[in-house]
Amino acid sequence: MDMFSWQLGLPSTLACLVFGYLLGSIPFGLILTRMAGLGDVRKIGSGNIGATNVLRTGNRKLAAATLLFDALKGTAAAAIASYWGVEAGIAAGFAAFLGHLFPVWLSFRGGKGVATYIGVLLGLMPVMVLLFAAIWLAMAKITRYSSLSALVATAAVPIALYAAGNGKVAGLFAVMTAIAWIKHRANIQRLLSGTESRIGEKG
């Protein structure tokens, strides 16, 4: 599959982008913590709306629910749009990822995108989720760094997709990986300085 060719018409592409963005911009971490009476998750820990920061409330079930819903919005966007072809799924999935990172409802301050990244991957190439999970779990067991595990796993995905002959999807995830790394720049700095929190530690 040619990574650079694009056959989907402009109106259809725009429709997929809008659909994906609106779905991806739903801030489940914020909604769930408020519904649970835990206040504004943006005012605790890292200030992030993702599952890792929700976990800092001490409510593991709520963090798991946030992870699930943040992933599923990416899956739904990509899978539903894919009914009209892989390019539609790519456009909607990418927009859902951006919607999570930059939700218009929260002044464009969202999460770091790993859960939604996984969700989009599930919607487009389900088998690759197994690769992501295997790498993440292996790295987490060895290093106990959640952020490093995610960074390594996201780096491996586009390489594996390209090697499998899925050029367009590989291109999508190469871009998403680059964005995810940028969103994790503070984590990268802490990893380099040895101050990043390990799994099971508060911080």
Swiss-Prot record:
<dbReference type="InterPro" id="IPR003811">
    <property type="entry name" value="G3P_acylTferase_PlsY"/>
</dbReference>
<keyword id="KW-1208">Phospholipid metabolism</keyword>
<dbReference type="GO" id="GO:0043772">
    <property type="term" value="F:acyl-phosphate glycerol-3-phosphate acyltransferase activity"/>
</dbReference>
<feature type="transmembrane region" description="Helical">
    <location>
        <begin position="62"/>
        <end position="82"/>
    </location>
</feature>
<keyword id="KW-0443">Lipid metabolism</keyword>
<keyword id="KW-0472">Membrane</keyword>
<feature type="transmembrane region" description="Helical">
    <location>
        <begin position="13"/>
        <end position="33"/>
    </location>
</feature>
<keyword id="KW-1003">Cell membrane</keyword>
<keyword id="KW-0594">Phospholipid biosynthesis</keyword>
<protein>
    <recommendedName>
        <fullName>Glycerol-3-phosphate acyltransferase</fullName>
        <ecNumber>2.3.1.275</ecNumber>
    </recommendedName>
</protein>
<feature type="transmembrane region" description="Helical">
    <location>
        <begin position="118"/>
        <end position="138"/>
    </location>
</feature>
<keyword id="KW-0997">Cell inner membrane</keyword>
<feature type="transmembrane region" description="Helical">
    <location>
        <begin position="88"/>
        <end position="108"/>
    </location>
</feature>
<keyword id="KW-0812">Transmembrane</keyword>
<feature type="transmembrane region" description="Helical">
    <location>
        <begin position="159"/>
        <end position="179"/>
    </location>
</feature>
<dbReference type="Pfam" id="PF02660">
    <property type="entry name" value="G3P_acyltransf"/>
</dbReference>
<comment type="subunit">
    <text>Probably interacts with PlsX.</text>
</comment>
<comment type="pathway">
    <text>Lipid metabolism; phospholipid metabolism.</text>
</comment>
<comment type="function">
    <text>Catalyzes the transfer of an acyl group from acyl-phosphate (acyl-PO(4)) to glycerol-3-phosphate (G3P) to form lysophosphatidic acid (LPA). This enzyme utilizes acyl-phosphate as fatty acyl donor, but not acyl-CoA or acyl-ACP.</text>
</comment>
<keyword id="KW-1133">Transmembrane helix</keyword>
<dbReference type="GO" id="GO:0005886">
    <property type="term" value="C:plasma membrane"/>
</dbReference>
<dbReference type="GO" id="GO:0008654">
    <property type="term" value="P:phospholipid biosynthetic process"/>
</dbReference>
<keyword id="KW-0444">Lipid biosynthesis</keyword>
<keyword id="KW-0808">Transferase</keyword>
<comment type="similarity">
    <text>Belongs to the PlsY family.</text>
</comment>
